[in-house]
Protein backbone atom coordinates (compact mmCIF):
# COMPACT_ATOMS: atom_id res chain seq x y z
CA UNK A 1 0.00 0.00 0.00
CA UNK A 2 1.21 3.52 -0.68
CA UNK A 3 2.46 5.75 2.11
CA UNK A 4 -0.34 8.28 1.63
CA UNK A 5 -4.00 7.37 1.94
CA UNK A 6 -4.96 9.00 -1.38
CA UNK A 7 -2.35 7.32 -3.59
CA UNK A 8 -1.93 3.79 -4.92
CA UNK A 9 1.27 2.01 -5.86
CA UNK A 10 1.43 -0.88 -8.31
CA UNK A 11 0.98 -3.48 -5.55
CA UNK A 12 -2.34 -1.95 -4.55
CA UNK A 13 -3.43 -1.45 -8.17
CA UNK A 14 -2.86 -5.17 -8.81
CA UNK A 15 -5.29 -5.97 -5.98
CA UNK A 16 -8.09 -4.00 -7.67
CA UNK A 17 -7.57 -4.57 -11.39
CA UNK A 18 -7.67 -8.06 -12.95
CA UNK A 19 -5.45 -6.93 -15.84
CA UNK A 20 -1.91 -8.25 -16.16
CA UNK A 21 0.90 -7.85 -18.67
CA UNK A 22 0.54 -6.72 -21.39
CA UNK A 23 -2.86 -5.21 -20.57
CA UNK A 24 -2.26 -3.55 -17.21
CA UNK A 25 -1.92 0.06 -18.34
CA UNK A 26 -1.84 2.04 -15.07
CA UNK A 27 1.50 2.33 -13.24
CA UNK A 28 0.57 4.53 -10.28
CA UNK A 29 -2.25 6.58 -8.82
CA UNK A 30 -0.93 9.95 -7.71
CA UNK A 31 -4.13 11.17 -6.07
CA UNK A 32 -7.81 10.33 -5.69
CA UNK A 33 -10.84 11.67 -3.90
CA UNK A 34 -13.64 9.15 -3.32
CA UNK A 35 -16.70 9.94 -5.39
CA UNK A 36 -14.95 12.73 -7.27
CA UNK A 37 -11.70 12.22 -9.14
CA UNK A 38 -8.53 10.22 -9.69
CA UNK A 39 -5.13 11.10 -11.21
CA UNK A 40 -3.07 8.16 -12.52
CA UNK A 41 -0.01 7.75 -14.74
CA UNK A 42 1.26 5.38 -17.42
CA UNK A 43 4.93 5.47 -18.39
CA UNK A 44 5.19 4.60 -22.07
CA UNK A 45 8.42 2.86 -23.12
CA UNK A 46 9.76 1.54 -26.41
CA UNK A 47 9.46 -1.95 -24.84
CA UNK A 48 5.65 -1.89 -25.06
CA UNK A 49 4.61 -4.91 -27.18
CA UNK A 50 2.25 -2.87 -29.37
CA UNK A 51 5.13 -0.77 -30.76
CA UNK A 52 6.41 -3.80 -32.72
CA UNK A 53 3.57 -3.41 -35.18
CA UNK A 54 2.13 0.08 -34.50
CA UNK A 55 4.26 1.40 -36.20
CA UNK A 56 7.87 0.15 -36.45
CA UNK A 57 9.19 3.25 -38.24
CA UNK A 58 7.13 5.77 -36.21
CA UNK A 59 5.93 4.14 -32.94
CA UNK A 60 2.47 5.37 -31.87
CA UNK A 61 0.47 4.11 -28.89
CA UNK A 62 -2.89 2.87 -30.25
CA UNK A 63 -5.75 5.16 -29.30
CA UNK A 64 -7.85 2.24 -28.11
CA UNK A 65 -5.16 1.46 -25.52
CA UNK A 66 -5.18 5.06 -24.28
CA UNK A 67 -8.94 4.65 -23.83
CA UNK A 68 -8.45 1.26 -22.13
CA UNK A 69 -5.98 2.84 -19.67
CA UNK A 70 -8.51 5.60 -19.01
CA UNK A 71 -11.16 2.93 -18.38
CA UNK A 72 -8.82 1.17 -15.93
CA UNK A 73 -8.44 4.47 -14.06
CA UNK A 74 -12.24 4.79 -13.88
CA UNK A 75 -12.45 1.25 -12.51
CA UNK A 76 -10.02 2.17 -9.74
CA UNK A 77 -12.03 5.28 -8.90
CA UNK A 78 -15.25 3.23 -8.88
CA UNK A 79 -13.77 0.71 -6.43
CA UNK A 80 -12.50 3.50 -4.18
CA UNK A 81 -15.78 5.42 -4.40
CA UNK A 82 -17.80 2.41 -3.29
CA UNK A 83 -15.23 1.75 -0.52
CA UNK A 84 -15.17 -1.79 -1.82
CA UNK A 85 -12.33 -4.13 -0.97
CA UNK A 86 -10.69 -6.00 -3.86
CA UNK A 87 -12.45 -9.29 -4.53
CA UNK A 88 -12.16 -11.90 -7.27
CA UNK A 89 -15.98 -11.92 -7.26
CA UNK A 90 -16.48 -8.24 -8.20
CA UNK A 91 -15.33 -6.41 -11.33
CA UNK A 92 -16.01 -3.03 -12.87
CA UNK A 93 -16.45 -3.58 -16.61
CA UNK A 94 -15.84 -1.01 -19.32
CA UNK A 95 -19.50 -0.57 -20.35
CA UNK A 96 -19.49 2.25 -22.87
CA UNK A 97 -17.78 5.24 -24.37
CA UNK A 98 -19.00 8.49 -25.87
CA UNK A 99 -17.38 11.64 -27.23
CA UNK A 100 -13.90 10.10 -27.61
CA UNK A 101 -11.42 12.52 -29.18
CA UNK A 102 -7.71 12.18 -29.91
CA UNK A 103 -5.67 15.38 -29.95
CA UNK A 104 -2.03 14.30 -29.76
CA UNK A 105 0.14 11.32 -30.66
CA UNK A 106 1.55 9.33 -27.73
CA UNK A 107 4.87 7.56 -28.20
CA UNK A 108 7.89 6.03 -26.46
CA UNK A 109 9.25 8.16 -23.62
CA UNK A 110 5.93 9.86 -22.91
CA UNK A 111 4.27 9.81 -19.52
CA UNK A 112 0.48 9.91 -19.74
CA UNK A 113 -1.43 11.59 -16.93
CA UNK A 114 -5.01 10.35 -16.67
CA UNK A 115 -7.55 12.56 -14.94
CA UNK A 116 -10.95 10.95 -14.44
CA UNK A 117 -13.95 12.56 -12.76
CA UNK A 118 -17.09 10.81 -11.61
CA UNK A 119 -20.20 12.45 -13.03
CA UNK A 120 -22.88 10.12 -11.65
CA UNK A 121 -23.55 6.60 -10.43
CA UNK A 122 -26.83 4.74 -10.45
CA UNK A 123 -27.57 1.07 -9.94
CA UNK A 124 -23.94 0.05 -10.24
CA UNK A 125 -23.27 1.99 -13.45
CA UNK A 126 -20.90 4.94 -13.22
CA UNK A 127 -20.41 7.72 -15.74
CA UNK A 128 -17.01 9.42 -15.84
CA UNK A 129 -15.24 12.11 -17.82
CA UNK A 130 -11.65 11.19 -18.65
CA UNK A 131 -8.74 13.16 -20.02
CA UNK A 132 -5.22 12.03 -20.89
CA UNK A 133 -2.36 14.54 -20.93
CA UNK A 134 1.25 14.34 -22.10
CA UNK A 135 3.56 17.20 -21.14
CA UNK A 136 0.53 19.23 -20.09
CA UNK A 137 -1.07 18.87 -23.53
CA UNK A 138 -4.44 17.12 -23.99
CA UNK A 139 -3.90 13.85 -25.87
CA UNK A 140 -7.34 12.24 -25.49
CA UNK A 141 -10.71 12.85 -23.86
CA UNK A 142 -13.85 10.73 -23.50
CA UNK A 143 -16.95 10.03 -21.49
CA UNK A 144 -16.65 6.51 -20.07
CA UNK A 145 -19.18 4.24 -18.41
CA UNK A 146 -18.31 1.31 -16.19
CA UNK A 147 -20.61 -1.25 -14.62
CA UNK A 148 -20.19 -3.17 -11.38
CA UNK A 149 -20.77 -6.88 -11.81
CA UNK A 150 -20.53 -9.79 -9.42
CA UNK A 151 -18.83 -12.83 -10.90
CA UNK A 152 -20.37 -16.21 -10.09
CA UNK A 153 -18.00 -19.11 -9.68
From Swiss-Prot:
GO terms for molecular function: (3R)-hydroxyacyl-[acyl-carrier-protein] dehydratase activity. It catalyses: a (3R)-hydroxyacyl-[ACP] = a (2E)-enoyl-[ACP] + H2O. InterPro entries: FabA_FabZ, FabZ, HotDog_dom_sf. SUPFAM superfamilies: Thioesterase/thiol ester dehydrase-isomerase (SSF54637). The active site is at 54. Pfam families: FabA (PF07977). Keywords: Cytoplasm, Lipid A biosynthesis, Lipid biosynthesis, Lipid metabolism, Lyase. It is found in: Cytoplasm. Involved in unsaturated fatty acids biosynthesis. Catalyzes the dehydration of short chain beta-hydroxyacyl-ACPs and long chain saturated and unsaturated beta-hydroxyacyl-ACPs. This is 3-hydroxyacyl-[acyl-carrier-protein] dehydratase FabZ. It comes from Shewanella denitrificans (strain OS217 / ATCC BAA-1090 / DSM 15013).
